[in-house]
């Protein structure tokens, strides 16, 4: 069953039109409460397959399923009402063929009510992007560092540091742009390359570890909120330190339970006489 809201949301076309106007603001969201908090402040929320690592403790995003993405897409739609919501196509749900990609993407849109899907890939995925867009499915592209390919690319590292990598990013970005993506995530890409493709593409670029030269920025919300003490990529800034705050709150709760000071009289139901 689709999850619909009555208020008018920002659309993929709205996001695309922001290029050259002002920076585009985006974050990931996976749950209803977080979506509700982020919705007033962002242009679009990405229900990213990063949820596999952030919420489920997986080592990579490869183990994320289509059913997982749909469930979390529904949750984010319930918690948001004004921003555009984009849901990731997970690994294995679109690479086989453009027809498989359409079936997966159509299911996401119908069952979540979201506005668009995101897929990773460069020139090799351009035909798929064009196929989806021509059939009414807006696509957010993703070039540069591609987490779904970590098993074949040798890990998480920035790209664009040699001529071969620069040529590939240029080719990939242009192909996805020409295919009709409404915006393109550029991940883990050195600043000169990010600046160059941002200046040449029709679609806005959304950077994550790709410098302020991009048309907008996205971060994993759990990263920027400081929920992980043992993991902080160079491109992440902690805008809050929630991990120690949560730890302290739980410690205080445990101490009060053990001391029988919680629940207090104000938290207890009484019989009225």
From Swiss-Prot:
Principal location listed in the UniProt entry: cytoplasm
Enzyme Commission number, as recorded: 2.1.2.11
Gene Ontology molecular functions: 3-methyl-2-oxobutanoate hydroxymethyltransferase activity; magnesium ion binding
Binding locations of Mg(2+): 49, 88, 120
Pfam families: Pantoate_transf
Subcellular location: Cytoplasm
Pathway assigned in UniProt: Cofactor biosynthesis; (R)-pantothenate biosynthesis; (R)-pantoate from 3-methyl-2-oxobutanoate: step 1/2
GO BP: pantothenate biosynthetic process
Keywords: Cytoplasm, Magnesium, Metal-binding, Pantothenate biosynthesis, Transferase
GO cellular component: cytoplasm
InterPro entries, A to Z: Pantoate_hydroxy_MeTrfase (IPR003700), Pyrv/PenolPyrv_kinase-like_dom (IPR015813), Pyrv_kinase-like_dom_sf (IPR040442)
Reactions this protein catalyses: 3-methyl-2-oxobutanoate + (6R)-5,10-methylene-5,6,7,8-tetrahydrofolate + H2O = 2-dehydropantoate + (6S)-5,6,7,8-tetrahydrofolate
Active site: 187
Cofactor needs: Mg(2+)
Enzyme type, top EC level: transferase
Quaternary state and interactors: Homodecamer; pentamer of dimers.
Function recorded in the entry: Catalyzes the reversible reaction in which hydroxymethyl group from 5,10-methylenetetrahydrofolate is transferred onto alpha-ketoisovalerate to form ketopantoate.
HAMAP family: PanB (MF_00156)
Name under which the protein is recorded: 3-methyl-2-oxobutanoate hydroxymethyltransferase
Protein's gene: panB
């Amino acid at each position: 069953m689709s999850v619909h809201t009555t208020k008018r949301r920002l659309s993929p076309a709205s996001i695309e039109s922001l290029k050259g106007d002002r920076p585009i603001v985006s974050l990931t969201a996976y749950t209803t409460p977080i979506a509700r908090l982020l919705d007033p402040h962002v242009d679009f929320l990405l229900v990213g397959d990063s949820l596999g690592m952030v919420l489920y403790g997986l080592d990579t995003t490869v183990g994320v399923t289509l059913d997982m993405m749909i469930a979390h897409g529904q949750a984010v739609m319930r918690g948001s009402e004004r921003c555009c919501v984009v849901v990731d196509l997970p690994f294995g749900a679109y690479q086989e063929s453009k027809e498989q990609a359409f079936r997966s993407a159509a299911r996401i849109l119908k069952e979540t009510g979201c506005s668009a899907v995101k897929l990773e890939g460069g020139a090799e995925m351009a035909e798929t992007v064009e196929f989806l867009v021509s059939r009414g499915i807006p696509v957010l592209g993703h070039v540069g560092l591609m987490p779904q390919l970590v098993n074949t690319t040798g890990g998480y590292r920035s790209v664009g540091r040699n001529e071969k990598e620069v040529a590939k990013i240029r080719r990939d970005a242009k192909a996805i742009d020409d295919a009709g993506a409404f915006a393109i995530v550029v991940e883990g890409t050195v600043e000169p390359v990010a600046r160059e493709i941002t200046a040449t593409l029709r679609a806005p670029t959304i950077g994550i570890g790709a410098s302020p030269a991009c048309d907008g920025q996205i971060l994993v919300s759990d990263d920027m909120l400081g929920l992980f003490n043992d993991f902080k990529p160079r491109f992440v800034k902690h805008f809050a330190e929630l991990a120690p705050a949560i730890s302290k709150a739980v410690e205080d709760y445990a101490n009060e339970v053990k001391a029988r000071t919680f629940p207090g009289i104000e938290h207890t139901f009484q019989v009225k006489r």
